[in-house]
Curated annotation (Swiss-Prot):
One of the primary rRNA binding proteins, this protein initially binds near the 5'-end of the 23S rRNA. It is important during the early stages of 50S assembly. It makes multiple contacts with different domains of the 23S rRNA in the assembled 50S subunit and ribosome. The gene is rplD. Coiled coil: none annotated. This is Large ribosomal subunit protein uL4. Gene3D superfamilies: 3.40.1370.10. It comes from the Bacteria. Residues 46-72 are annotated as: Disordered.
């Protein structure tokens, strides 16, 4: 059974906690489907080309129908002309969203957590809180404190998951390129797969692994 690594206040390993047994044997295809769903939902539908009705010009016949030796033409907005309309071009009314079932979302999240635990990249700490130093009635050195926490983990990049994230913790991690801090309500399988390691507050971990099959 896969286990998450429990860290103490100095981010040193002090134990482990098991993931629920239902996490075993989940098909990895659920994660693939969720990633496709996530990326397609985020896709901006902005690609647009003008058809022959939308390009400017073309109000008159460019040359006489007969006698010139050239192929007949009725308007310079025809797709055969340079600067004419585009045939079968991109339109901005396409829906790229891919449907995914609620159960598949849950299974994708569970598989991603299981995968991180098997790779020993899932960590649990009591609390993720960056307070900084109060100077002149302002909190300073927030990013410095967050970076020290990240460096202590010795990971390539890290996703931090809080139970109830405060604004100072969010601000502290915003300036770090290889870190992202989120509330547990924002946790999804794509983010778990995108980062090489995950650090979760104990309360956030318990919330994430609770059985949601009846919801």
């Amino acid at each position: 059974m896969s286990k998450a690594i429990v860290l103490d206040s100095h981010l040193k390993e002090k134990g482990s906690v098991e993931l629920p047994k239902r996490y075993e044997g989940i098909n990895s295809h659920n994660l693939y489907l969720y990633v496709k769903h996530y990326l397609s939902s985020a896709r901006a539908n902005t690609a647009k080309s003008k058809n022959r009705a939308e390009v400017s010009g073309g109000g008159r016949k460019p040359w006489a129908q007969k006698g010139g030796g050239r192929a007949r033409a009725g308007s310079i907005t025809s797709p055969v002309f340079v600067g004419g309309g585009v045939s079968h071009g991109a339109t901005n009314n396409r829906n790229y969203n891919l449907k995914i079932n609620k159960k598949q979302k849950r299974l994708a999240l569970e598989y991603a957590l299981e995968e991180k635990a098997q790779a020993n990249k899932l960590f649990v700490v009591e609390k993720i809180a960056i307070k900084g130093v109060v100077e002149d009635n302002k909190r300073k050195h927030l990013t410095k404190e967050a970076n020290q926490m990240f460096q202590a983990l010795e990971q390539r990049d890290t996703l931090f998951v809080c139970m109830n994230m405060d604004e100072y913790t969010e601000l502290a991690f915003n300036n770090l390129k290889k870190c992202l801090v989120i509330d547990v309500s924002e946790l999804n399988a794509y983010l778990l797969a995108a980062f090489s390691s995950v650090v979760m507050e104990e309360a956030a971990f318990q919330h994430a692994v609770q059985d949601k099959t009846e919801e």
